[in-house]
Amino acid sequence: MAASQQQASATTSTASVSGPGSAGGSGPQQQPQPPAQLVGPAQSGLLQQQQQDFDPVQRYKMLIPQLKESLQTLMKVAAQNLIQNTNIDNGQKSSDGPIQRFDKCLEEFYALCDQLELCLRLAHECLSQSCDSAKHSPTLVPTATKPDAVQPDSLPYPQYLAVIKAQIACAKDIHTALLDCANKVTGKTPAPPTGPGGTL
């Protein structure tokens, strides 16, 4: 009798220690994890793609292999068409296989050339603007292709716009002052301002 009571008390203590979760119970349910954001290689690849879209030099480098391949295809199709036309003129049987159209290959080649020309023009314009910005506003401005490369002495873009507007207003004031001085030297009177109804 005493042994059975000890065995029952041991079973009760084991159940109380293990708890409802380990004795076949459901236990606390885990909350569903939110979907993970793009991190690591996926995010870096997306950022690199955006930089390539913005940077005309990177775009130019990407188009060069395509241009080489298009030129090789164009020369190959031109040779095939020339051989076929020569065989037809000589009364010989031409190849039965389909031959690509020369005009479509030439159009694709010219389209790539136009894209390369636009990239070069855009790169030249960006270089000119960068030189003018460095000349008239020595403070650096973060670019769209490298937004993270912000230096401590860089100028925010809204403040940069304010500086440019102030420079434009100053240039207009200088132009007006020089024009007034030239009119005074030559003795010419400036033209009276005109309103909507004519001369005031």
From Swiss-Prot:
Keyword rRNA-binding: no
One Gene Ontology MF term: transcription coregulator activity
Stretch list, region Disordered: 1-48
Sites of N-acetylalanine modification: A2
Pfam families xref list: Med29
Keyword Protein biosynthesis carried by entry: no
Superkingdom of the source species: Eukaryota
Assembly mode: Component of the TRAP/SMCC mediator complex. Interacts with MED20/TRFP. Associates with the MED18-MED20 heteromer.
Name used for this protein in its record: Mediator of RNA polymerase II transcription subunit 29
